[in-house]
A protein has these predicted regions:
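Active-site bordering "gate/hinge" segments
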Residues: 1-215
Length: 215
């Protein structure tokens, strides 16, 4: 098992990723974490932002009681903020937010208000930094992901098949489509690291067919 300690190369990884998000000297950067966040990633974020010359501050929340019967992390549905207005205001007033919460803010109820302030938010998945190092953002992914999102948004149906017998017809009419390439430099937006995916959320009842799972 790899140790969770500060490594120079991991500071480099965080700094390079934050630089892709447009973080420069003098920017106000908030590090949002909670009591069950991975400490090494919180420290790496702080050191990387300091290296870039950002003005860094921490917001540390108490991890809420579990509401799911299974381990949950990096879902994007964090409820750690708990509608605390001072926290939302502090994040919305920042230039950049490094999201180190356990689940991430991607689908959090407070995200729209945070983005309205113009903050750029990067959700750092709750993984060992060695995994983040192996999944560094690649600028070549951005145009490919954007092209994939465009195809999803223009498509009416998706067909999924496999040699095992899967044969699914999925209606994409009205589906929400999106994606991420591992960084964001546009104010009022969020992305997540690792990135490099396109996805759609079909409406209820829009999937028909057979899903075969090999034994």
């Amino acid at each position: 098992m790899l140790q969770e300690r500060i490594e120079a190369r991991w500071i480099d990884c965080f700094a390079e990723t934050f630089a892709l998000c447009g973080v420069t000297a003098g920017d106000t950067a908030a590090i949002l974490s909670e009591t069950q966040s991975r400490p090494v990633n919180v420290h790496l974020a702080e050191l990387a932002l300091a290296r870039l010359g950002a003005r860094v501050f921490h917001l540390v929340l108490q991890s809420p009681r579990l509401t799911a019967p299974v381990p949950v992390r990096s879902t994007g549905a964090s409820d750690a903020i708990g509608q605390l207005a001072p926290v939302v205001q502090a994040l919305a007033g920042s230039t950049f937010v490094a999201d180190l919460t356990v689940e991430g803010l991607l689908h959090a109820a407070e995200l729209p208000d945070i983005l309205k302030g113009g903050a750029r938010v990067l959700m750092v998945s709750n993984e060992h930094p060695e995994i983040l190092e192996r999944c560094m953002p690649d600028v070549a992914l951005e145009p490919r992901v954007k092209a994939g999102i465009k195809r999803l948004r223009s498509a009416k149906t998706m067909h999924v098949s496999s040699p095992a017998g899967t044969d699914l017809a999925i209606s994409l009419v009205g589906a929400q489509a999106g994606g991420g390439w591992g960084y964001t430099a546009r104010p009022g937006t969020i992305s997540h690291w690792p990135g490099g995916l396109c996805l759609a959320f079909p409406a209820e009842g829009s999937v028909n067919g057979t899903l075969a799972i090999p034994s």
